[in-house]
């Protein structure tokens, strides 16, 4: 399918397809959530999360959970799912996983963890999406 490494735009398109196909019990949390793709996580993000290996981070949900929002948050930045292109592509190469499925599972994982879903719940959501 790809004769060259997928671009940022390719990953954005896959993530948008993933959001459109995400299981309903997770989709209800996603009103107004954006998608951003960066090549690699920056040092500040890695430090904030306590992650030493930048290649280990494929995505991150940045935002405020719905239950923690207040009327005073009107001017806050919109929530965004950040996908890290190069770590995703490395995992894609190493595992042979379908790229859409890999991106979809990163999106599901980030959203679900942000909203407090357990690892078992996340595995169930990934199965539902298949």
Residue map of PLM features:
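Active-site rim/adjacent substrate-binding subdomains
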Residues: 1-102, 114, 118-124, 129
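Catalytic glutamate of the conserved HExxH
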Residues: 106, 110-114
């Amino acid at each position: 399918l790809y004769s060259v490494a997928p671009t940022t735009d390719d990953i954005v398109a896959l993530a948008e397809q993933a959001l459109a196909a995400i299981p309903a019990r997770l989709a209800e949390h996603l009103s107004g959530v954006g998608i951003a793709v960066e090549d690699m996580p920056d040092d500040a993000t890695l430090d904030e999360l306590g992650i030493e290996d930048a290649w280990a981070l494929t995505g991150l949900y940045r935002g405020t959970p719905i239950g923690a929002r207040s009327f005073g948050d009107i001017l806050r930045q919109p929530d965004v799912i950040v996908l890290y292109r190069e770590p995703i592509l490395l995992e894609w190469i190493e595992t042979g996983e379908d790229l859409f499925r890999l991106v979809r599972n990163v999106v599901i994982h980030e959203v679900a963890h942000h909203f407090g879903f357990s690892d078992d719940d996340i595995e169930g959501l990934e199965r539902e999406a298949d």
